């Protein structure tokens, strides 16, 4: 069995790491290169860097920051934000990213994901899905939750069902899915395990859980109950509540295979 991964996430806005609650109410958490260096030293399995306003501001992700980060950290680096065309992916990979996350552009042009996977290999294409729980639906007399995907850093609703979208992205060639519960983001109440289960049971690519971690138990629940392959967190690491080592030790103690 493959070891499960812990991935600290750096949401970056105007060159600073920030952390919000449900995609708003933003707090400063430091310089991205310094923060990434700290997680590299703590034994993070990967680091994710998301330029959270690149799409809504219609600009490119800061390549210079990615270059500096890639020189400093020696674990796989996933970069996203403002990725709209093949050249953006090439530039990010050339700047030192190991994987590139596509979010809004996948919604506008789904075939872009397939084209990117074909050109660069699906191992370096991550599709990021920002999902919000909407009105429940009835299926065969059973009330089921339904999630919809949002774009532009969680600002624009699409009407697209998140679970069906996850399947479509996996079929088109995404090597991995980064699934964020917008309802959970920054709330510290735990992942949306129902959402994670719905997606992990329907796709055959790795799924990363994101949105809502408040303690180490939440990380373990993502794997044990949500069925995910990797757990992403920000607040609990950024503000010094836990280190990555503590998180790994806790998960290993729960019987989860980790790289210690």
From Swiss-Prot:
The reaction(s) this protein catalyses: 5-[(5-phospho-1-deoxy-D-ribulos-1-ylimino)methylamino]-1-(5-phospho-beta-D-ribosyl)imidazole-4-carboxamide + L-glutamine = D-erythro-1-(imidazol-4-yl)glycerol 3-phosphate + 5-amino-1-(5-phospho-beta-D-ribosyl)imidazole-4-carboxamide + L-glutamate + H(+)
Residues of the active site: 11, 130
Gene3D superfamilies: Aldolase class I
Keyword ATP-binding: no
EC number(s) on file: 4.3.2.10
InterPro entries according to UniProt: Aldolase_TIM (IPR013785), His_biosynth (IPR006062), HisF (IPR004651), IGPS_HisA/HisF (IPR050064), RibuloseP-bd_barrel (IPR011060)
Intracellular or extracellular location(s): Cytoplasm
Enzyme class: lyase
Keywords linked to the UniProt accession: Amino-acid biosynthesis, Cytoplasm, Histidine biosynthesis, Lyase
GO biological process, any: L-histidine biosynthetic process
Pathway: Amino-acid biosynthesis; L-histidine biosynthesis; L-histidine from 5-phospho-alpha-D-ribose 1-diphosphate: step 5/9
Family according to the record: Belongs to the HisA/HisF family.
Subunit structure: Heterodimer of HisH and HisF.
Function of the molecule: IGPS catalyzes the conversion of PRFAR and glutamine to IGP, AICAR and glutamate. The HisF subunit catalyzes the cyclization activity that produces IGP and AICAR from PRFAR using the ammonia provided by the HisH subunit.
Protein name per its UniProtKB record: Imidazole glycerol phosphate synthase subunit HisF
Organism: Psychrobacter arcticus (strain DSM 17307 / VKM B-2377 / 273-4)
Name of the encoding gene: hisF
């Amino acid at each position: 069995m493959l070891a499960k991964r812990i991935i600290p996430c750096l949401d970056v806005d105007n060159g600073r790491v920030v952390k919000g609650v449900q995609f708003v109410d933003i707090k400063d958490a430091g310089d991205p290169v310094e923060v990434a260096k700290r997680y590299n030293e703590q034994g993070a399995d990967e680091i994710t860097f998301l330029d959270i306003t690149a799409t809504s501001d219609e600009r490119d992700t800061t390549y210079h920051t990615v270059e500096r980060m890639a020189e400093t950290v020696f674990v796989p680096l996933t970069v996203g934000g403002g990725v709209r065309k093949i050249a953006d992916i090439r530039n990010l990979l050339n700047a030192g990213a190991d994987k590139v996350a596509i979010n809004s552009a996948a919604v506008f042009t789904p075939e872009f994901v397939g084209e990117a996977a074909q050109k660069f290999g699906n191992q370096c294409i991550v599709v990021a899905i920002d999902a919000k729980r909407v009105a429940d639906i009835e299926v065969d007399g059973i009330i089921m939750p339904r999630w919809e995907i949002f774009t532009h850093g969680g600002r624009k609703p699409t009407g697209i069902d998140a679970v069906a979208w996850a399947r479509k992205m996996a079929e088109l060639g995404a090597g991995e899915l980064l699934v964020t519960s917008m309802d959970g983001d920054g709330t510290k109440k735990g992942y949306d395990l129902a959402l994670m289960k719905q997606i992990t049971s329907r796709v055959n690519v790795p799924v990363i859980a994101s949105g809502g971690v408040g303690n180490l138990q939440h990380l373990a629940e993502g794997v044990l109950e949500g069925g995910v392959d990797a757990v992403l967190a920000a607040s609990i690491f950024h503000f010094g509540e836990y280190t990555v080592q503590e998180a790994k030790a806790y998960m290993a103690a729960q019987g989860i295979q980790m790289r210690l």
